Amino acid sequence: MTLHRKYGSDERIIIHCETVTKVAKILADAMLKEGKEVDVKAVLAGAMLHDIGRSRVHSVRHGLEGANIVEGEGVEMKVVEIVRKHVGAGISREEARALQLPDLDYIPATLEEMIVCFSDKMVDADRVRPFEAEVHRFTVKGHDVSRLVALKRRLQQELGEDPEKVIFDKVKETQ
């Protein structure tokens, strides 16, 4: 929260990041219960900071800007990578070049990166929503829906069940 305040993040962005953090914690805890090794602290920090780059820019570059901010603040590289790779369902090296981003691979690869990226896709503003709503948004915007579906599938393989169901079951428990 200190970094969000320092860099002037809008209150809506902070609330969104808090909601994504709650969703990411649900998934990280479920992974731990399945015996998966997951750095929960990195997941929570990455989820809370994933949109800090929006304090500078509201484009596809916000992931890169956010990564630069948190790296400059001395945040652990694992968290820097989570912030950098959360945009869309990831951005390939070729897409990055076309978007005039640094020539890097922005596709979530670690369990922590995938958890935060997926959690972000499950949250619209401060509301958890069905995965199909994000599929629809990706389709309308012309984004790579297959990469989004693959992200969910990868998490499902790790978790042994549908991550969307895990999230909604837990959300229902807390209501």
Ranges and model annotations:
Residues 6-36, 49, 75, 95-175:
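Divalent metal-dependent phosphate-bond-processing catalytic cores, especially two-metal-ion Mg2+/Mn2+ enzymes
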Residues 20, 38-73, 80-90:
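His-Asp-centered metal-binding catalytic motifs of divalent-metal-dependent phosphohydrolases/nucleases
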